[in-house]
Amino acid sequence: MDAMDAKTAVSIIIPFYNGIDWLEMIFVAFGKQTFKDFEVIVADDGSREDVVARLEELMARQPFPVTHLWQEDCGFRKNRMLNKAVVQSRAEYLIFLDGDCIPHRKFVEEHCKARREGFVVAGRRVDLPAALSEGMSVGKVASPGFERKLVWPLLY
């Protein structure tokens, strides 16, 4: 059996369009997950050539499998790409994550624990103040205690 034919427990599907800095932060966060049996599928709705080149470099450095699906930019066709990603997935359990959401370290684990046949699991996001969002960086996401540092300012 080819490695790409092998099943994985979870496919995480991320819609994407030119937001490479956010995607890099998401990849850093996925590298810190407590649950490791997952793949990431980037459903790209026509990103620029320079962005795709940077994405390919980023994909090569990940400790988890990443598939990049791309279609020509012919207007907003995000849902078409999401459907293609579902078909391409190697798991029976799918998680959809927007391209500007940084998952906490137990994101995949908690989704798997909540999984029930015939049900959909929906999570919440935390709307960050603009100043906090604009100050996000790969270095901050990679730093120890990132989640703790992020949550406390929001609570007080």
Q: PLM features: what roles do these ranges have?
A:
Residues A29, D44-L55:
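A conserved acidic beta->alpha catalytic loop
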Residues K106-V141:
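Conserved donor NDP-sugar-binding/catalytic core segment of glycosyltransferases
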Residues D37-S47, T67-Q71:
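Short beta-strand/loop segment that forms part of the nucleotide-sugar
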Residues L94:
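Short aromatic/hydrophobic "clamp" motif used to bind/position activated sugar donors
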Residues D98-I102:
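The conserved acidic donor/metal-binding loop of glycosyltransferases
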Residues E72-S89, K106:
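Glycine-rich, basic loop-to-helix element that forms the pyrophosphate-binding segment
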Residues M1-K32:
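N-proximal low-complexity "stem/linker" segments adjacent to membrane-targeting elements
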Residues F27-V28, V52-A53, N83, A91, ...:
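Short alpha-helix within the catalytic core of nucleotide-sugar-dependent glycosyltransferases
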